[in-house]
Amino acid sequence: MAAVDIRDNLLGISWVDSSWIPILNSGSVLDYFSERSNPFYDRTCNNEVVKMQRLTLEHLNQMVGIEYILLHAQEPILFIIRKQQRQSPAQVIPLADYYIIAGVIYQAPDLGSVINSRVLTAVHGIQSAFDEAMSYCRYHPSKGYWWHFKDHEEQEKVKPKAKRKEEPSSIFQRQRVDALLIDLRQKFPPRFVQQKSGEKPVPVDQAKKEAEPLPETVKSEEKESTKNIQQTVSTKGPPEKRMRLQ
């Protein structure tokens, strides 16, 4: 496909030169508009001839052809420039209007472009409505036409929900998590006890658990001690009886 020339669709572009904005006024706006990089400016116009011959803009009235004039000015924000075809000192045909807002140049749409855009927007909306209505329309030779909306609702329910992709964490989030972990480590530092030389340090809680005897072992030791006492008592025998003195 051939590349589309930018001049074929001037309604969709704008142009600005920031160096001119501070000095833009009614006297310099036409010079600003005649910049070489401005796509809206026609090099074959009478303004270019007057500029090369260093004449005043009043000489445009005595010439025939395309020219640019300042139609309206509302300094320093708004300027309107008209492109027109001059046929005689008293007869001109407007060709296009351009408006400058805050230094940015736009081409004003003509009536045909406005009507075309509005009609296309309206037709697109009507066509979308008809397409949506036809998707619910059903026909059978014995029943005729009817509307059926349940299939569409069931299809929406059956459609699996797209899984949300896990977004990678940002640098700020990673730094924030590291700062919180360091803060927790400072508030609750781990404690270690060196049990034997050459071994790895063991946490204090674990060392306490190893040092404390289990309750079952304590009970078994108590039972063994009671048994030993009973055995010693049984081996000694009953105590001897002594005679009472009358």
UniProtKB/Swiss-Prot annotation:
The modification N6-acetyllysine is found at residues 236, 241. GO terms for biological process: positive regulation of transcription by RNA polymerase II; positive regulation of transcription elongation by RNA polymerase II; positive regulation of transcription initiation by RNA polymerase II; protein ubiquitination; RNA polymerase II preinitiation complex assembly; somatic stem cell population maintenance. Keywords: Acetylation, Activator, Isopeptide bond, Nucleus, Transcription, Transcription regulation, Ubl conjugation. InterPro entries: Mediator_Med6, Mediator_Med6_met/pln, Mediator_Med6_sf. GO terms for molecular function: DNA binding; transcription coactivator activity; transcription coactivator binding; ubiquitin protein ligase activity. It is found in: Nucleus. Its main location: nucleus. GO terms for cellular component: core mediator complex; mediator complex; nucleoplasm; nucleus; ubiquitin ligase complex. Residues 206-226 have a biased composition (Basic and acidic residues). It holds the Pfam family Med6. Belongs to the Mediator complex subunit 6 family. This is Mediator of RNA polymerase II transcription subunit 6. It comes from Mus musculus.
